[in-house]
Amino acid sequence: METKRVEIPGSVLDDLCSRFILHIPSEERDNAIRVCFQIELAHWFYLDFYMQNTPGLSQCGIRDFAKAVFSHCPFLLPEGEDVEKVLDEWKEYKMGVPTYGAIILDETLENVLLVQGYLAKSGWGFPKGKVNKEEAPHDCAAREVFEETGFDIKDYICKDDYIELRINDQLARLYIIPGIPKDTKFNPKTRREIRNIEWFSIEKLPCHRNDMTPKSKLGLAPNKFFMAIPFIRPLRDWLSRRFGDSSDSDNGFSSTGSTPAKPTVEKLSRTKFRHSQQLFPDGSPGDQWVKHRQPLQQKPYNNHSEMSDLLKGKKCEKKLHPRKLQDNFETDAVYDLPSSNEDQLLEHAEGQPVACNGHCKFPFSSRAFLSFKFDHNAIMKILDL
């Protein structure tokens, strides 16, 4: 079925071609891929200015616009080349260009900033864009985020803190920017590229395309977040690791250990955001799949004095001299407890592990092992072939 051709006035195409295409060097003008990039710039100008100031003009996508330009200036198309083939090659080339951007988190680390494209069917995603020639990744991320949100992350960005994925053979790296106030004013610097900028609760965003969480909690289908979905699970892993280094009860983990618990104001006041700090201490930057620390299954103690009494009792029972350990083989274990610090939590009588705040030694000997003896006759029978 033949598609309807977009009608753009010749005067408009003349102006756009003179602005963006005809002035480029001849060696670039002979390269159809390079011409397509210039046509893309002309298309943005057409949407930003002509569409806004000239009623009645046809709104069109980049493919239809490029066809109109090649039809208006056929000398731009290499001899014998098909327009559709050139556009397909250009699309494939663009997919190989890395994209850089940022994941902006609020002060509670519960919400993330997403942007929505200008077109009606556009979904929500993180602010990012393609890198320019000889542009550093972090500079590209700062430029794209500023263009799409009006917020400058140059003073917040850390070159080593990012999540990096390869999606359909295209590299995408998002730098993590935590601690941005929710009342920050965002305003896109480009026309007709970003329609909306909003904070979203991370726990309400989908981890995969069949995750119906946003449908039930936001009233939005999961495909509205298809650009953000690949980064949600790595982001949750990052949050788990961020608050998983403490061994106390306020360690930021939920009871399951699979998703981070909501950080409290008190906790965040203790956590200073140092953007030069390595946020992936146990893996390389951008390593998004992390193994969660398993919370210790420990027997609760009602108060400090209860634990202290227990430890004192243990020390009274196990006062052993290093040279007389043989006299105590009937006991189950040997505890070498530092007597000067009762704040160190040790293993109690039933063998249930608890957290240890200091350096504790646990020389342990099994009763079965200590009474073990080789059966010499049985061994010799085996060797007697």
Swiss-Prot record:
EC code(s) of this entry: 3.6.1.62
Binding site for Mn(2+): E144, E148
One Gene Ontology MF term: manganese ion binding
GO biological process entries: deadenylation-dependent decapping of nuclear-transcribed mRNA; histone mRNA catabolic process; mRNA catabolic process; nuclear-transcribed mRNA catabolic process, nonsense-mediated decay; regulation of mRNA stability
Modification Phosphoserine occurs at: S246, S247, S249, S276, S284
Domain Nudix hydrolase: 95-226
Chain spans, region Disordered: 247-266
Family annotation (SMART domains): DCP2
Record bears the keyword Hydrolase: yes
Main location (coarse class): cytoplasm
One Pfam family hit: DCP2
Reactions catalysed: a 5'-end (N(7)-methyl 5'-triphosphoguanosine)-ribonucleoside in mRNA + H2O = N(7)-methyl-GDP + a 5'-end phospho-ribonucleoside in mRNA + 2 H(+)
Co-factor note (free text): Mn(2+) ion is required for highest activity. Can also utilize magnesium ions.
Subunit details: Found in a mRNA decay complex with LSM1, LSM3, LSM4, EXOSC2, EXOSC4, EXOSC10, PARN, XRN1, CNOT6, UPF1, UPF2 and UPF3B. Forms a complex with DCP1A, EDC3, DDX6 and EDC4/HEDLS, within this complex directly interacts with EDC4/HEDLS. Interacts with DPC1B, UPF1, UPF2 and UPF3B. Associates with polysomes. Interacts (via N-terminus and C-terminus) with TRIM21 (via N-terminus and C-terminus). Interacts with LIMD1, WTIP and AJUBA. Interacts with DDX17 in an RNA-dependent manner. Interacts with ZC3HAV1. Interacts with APOBEC3G in an RNA-dependent manner. Interacts with ZFP36L1 (via N-terminus).
Protein name in the entry: m7GpppN-mRNA hydrolase
Species assigned in the record: Pongo abelii
Name of the gene encoding the protein in the UniProt record: DCP2
